[in-house]
Amino acid sequence: IGGIPAANAKCASHAGMTPAPHSSHPQAWGPLLQPPTVKTEPMDDGNFSKEQTSGFYSEGFHSASPSSSSKDSNGHSPRSSGSTREPSPFYDAMPLKAKANLGMHLDSFRNSLPYSLLTPPGFESRASDARDHSPSYESYSPRTLAPPAHVSHPLGRSDATPPKSPPRTPSSPERRSFDRFHDSGFDGVDHNKHDGDDGREGSGLEDDFDEEPGLRVPAVNSHGKVKTFKCKQCEFVAVTKLSFWEHSKEHIKPEKMLCCRKCPFVTEYKHHLEYHMRNHMGSKPFQCSQCSYSCVNKSMLNSHLKSHSNVYQYRCADCNYATKYCDSLKLHLRKYQHNPAMVLNLDGTPNPLPIIDVYGTRRGPKQKPLSKIFEQQTGTNNHSP
């Protein structure tokens, strides 16, 4: 009887039959007979590995998406056959821990701001106070299970009001100069009234330009000639006010430039801007006593009063040219290279004091010092026989 198994084994070996796997290799079937282990979410804060706490951008993002480059999809997925790790379910707790870790980073970034993003300018109450005193989802959210992240220290008070936004357009030097002009007590401008009559704030400059066609169209004087505007600092000559004002900006420093709000008028003198603003408002306080003429300053009134006089104060010494205005005499002297004669008073008597500055920019004649007149008189008396 004892020889029968040996004979059977010998016959099986001669027949080419393979032995049973459980008899020859018992270690290959051992893991299959054991009950599968199920991975559960740990509740202790100290049981997290370094790989699980690496942050949202390392493993948490890949674990949330079943991509081919993810570690969880390669190592923990039951579909991978070459993995040497312990098998675990496909949907584990890594996405929750990654989101919790991301929330902690966002809280640290929010606490590092010097002001609250939810607090509007001028409103000092914190919008997050109600959140601190009210029941929050943080008490039961998965972020409480995540390991503590690095929290930076805040730079300042978290309830500080954020700084106000800068104006849409930076304040230009000419705008600051014009504001100083209005703050100086000029009583001719209504600050509460908009510049435009159509209710629009500011009322674009182009609309105001069209109200005065003389700005863009050349004007004709009483003699039928085109009126020109000559620059006093160079040889530039313009035929319109607009082109002349644009050229004047080249000779005025930005910190001294004064601009009109209703037109492109520019100047560096405060009283010139005041006279110009009176023209816009229709305010002409200087009235002529002999006609209905009115103007914005006394200099213009004095020039107008000469039109009612029969005395030609300014004359040429080389010809019979005579005029009532000093500027007209200067143009004549420059053109023909003549010399001026003695200036007359309004009553027609000679006046030795005024000096005609032919090539100067001064409006009107200069006044000769009395000491020079006395020296001239004494010199003529000494040379006389």
Curated annotation (Swiss-Prot):
Disulfide bonds: none annotated. One of its GO terms (biological process) is segmentation. GO terms for cellular component: nucleus. Keywords: Developmental protein, DNA-binding, Gap protein, Metal-binding, Nucleus, Repeat, Zinc, Zinc-finger. Its main location: nucleus. Residues 63-77 have a biased composition (Low complexity). SUPFAM superfamilies: beta-beta-alpha zinc fingers. It comes from the Eukaryota. Residues 126-135, 173-203 have a biased composition (Basic and acidic residues). Pfam families: zf-C2H2 (PF00096). One of its GO terms (molecular function) is zinc ion binding. InterPro entries: Znf_C2H2_sf, Znf_C2H2_type. A zinc finger (C2H2-type) spans 229-251, 258-280, 286-308, 314-338. Residues 1-94, 124-216, 361-385 are annotated as: Disordered. The keyword Hydrolase does not apply. It is found in: Nucleus. Belongs to the hunchback C2H2-type zinc-finger protein family. PANTHER family: PROTEIN HUNCHBACK (PTHR24392:SF49), ZINC FINGER PROTEIN (PTHR24392). Gap class segmentation protein that controls development of head structures. This is Protein hunchback. It comes from Bombyx mori (Silk moth).
